Amino acid sequence: MALLNIFDIAGSALAAQSKRLNVAASNLANADSVTGPDGQPYRAKQVVFQVDAAPGQATGGVKVASVIESQAPEKLVYEPGNPLADANGYVKMPNVDVVGEMVNTMSASRSYQANIEVLNTVKSMMLKTLTLGQ
């Protein structure tokens, strides 16, 4: 594998982790959004990754295959005075797991940093290669 391919692979990982961070930020921002444009509570999103290898290659980068809605049920919070409460006094809240989203945020951030380090290492190797003949 050529060193230049590493830039493509690490770059794809940076883009994928950036998308993961954006989705986690959106989930956290909407953790208390009781209603959305459709009148329903916000539904947490999840990023699905897949390998992005060139045909015939065993290795490759990563790409975002899709962003899907979490199938976890909405949380029910007892607030009988809330105008959005049902007949039993429960309000449907988003299915966002705040702790899980914080873990996703930290994991994506660490992965992003690791791929930056890969890029810096390859850059350093290429610069050292250029100075070998001196």
Swiss-Prot record:
InterPro entries assigned: Flag_bb_rod_N, Flagellar_basal_body_rod_CS, Flg_bb/hook_C_dom, FlgC
Q: Which superkingdom is the protein from?
A: Bacteria
Keyword Cell division applies: no
Extract the PROSITE patterns matched here.
FLAGELLA_BB_ROD
Localization, per the record, is: Bacterial flagellum basal body
Q: Which family does it belong to?
A: Belongs to the flagella basal body rod proteins family.
Q: What is this protein called?
A: Flagellar basal-body rod protein FlgC
- Its source organism is Salmonella typhimurium (strain LT2 / SGSC1412 / ATCC 700720)
Organism placement in taxonomy:
Bacteria, Pseudomonadati, Pseudomonadota, Gammaproteobacteria, Enterobacterales
